[in-house]
Regions:
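Charged, alpha-helix-forming regions
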Residues: 1-178
Length: 178
């Protein structure tokens, strides 16, 4: 079954720089998986998948656990009963290189919505989708933990090494002869 048969692929709505504000509640995504600013309302519900469709990041797959504003630089997908959005995220992420390979590179890189609609996504039962998501979420947490925790552990070991080195090399000063 293709992605376009399962759910509708929706392009976000354009905002101008004047529309963005620092006090806005909802992040705005356009041409990248990092927000370009904030806006006072959202047009996508929490736990939604996005695929960047324009610019250097075209074809990149993203996921937001919070409501957000999807600009016209992103494709998003309607939520449907037979498809767990986090499962869709992981499935599309596994196809990301293939998706990026179909980006038109002339001028400004662009991904056509037909490419995304024609993607074939295996759809197991919702229970199986949830099981897969649970496993992949654990791996994601472990990877994040390693990339954040390992530098901290290295720093602590370096300090421990310096402490013991200094202890070993701080010989007691001989008492002056009287």
């Amino acid at each position: 079954m293709t992605l376009g048969e399962m759910c509708s692929v929706q392009r976000g709505k354009r905002l101008t720089k004047r529309d963005l504000n620092h006090n806005g509640r909802y992040p705005v995504f356009h041409g990248g998986i990092e927000p370009i600013g904030y806006y006072s309302s959202s047009n996508r519900e929490a736990n939604s998948v996005m695929v960047i469709n324009v610019g250097a990041s075209a074809g990149t797959v993203g996921y937001s656990s919070k409501e957000f504003w999807s600009s016209d630089g992103c494709f998003c997908f309607s939520h449907c009963e037979q498809l767990n959005q986090k499962y869709l995220f992981y499935a599309l992420q596994s196809m990301e290189n293939s998706i990026k390979g179909q980006v038109r590179k002339a001028g400004i890189p662009t991904l056509d919505n037909k490419v995304v609609e024609k993607l074939k996504i295996p759809i197991p039962s919702l229970a199986e989708q949830q099981r897969i998501v649970s496993i992949l979420d654990k791996f994601e947490a472990l990877t994040t933990s390693i990339s954040e925790g390992l530098p901290k552990e290295i720093e602590l070991r370096r300090k421990q090494y310096e402490y013991y080195r200094n202890q070993l090399l701080s010989f007691a000063q001989p008492l002056p002869k009287t």
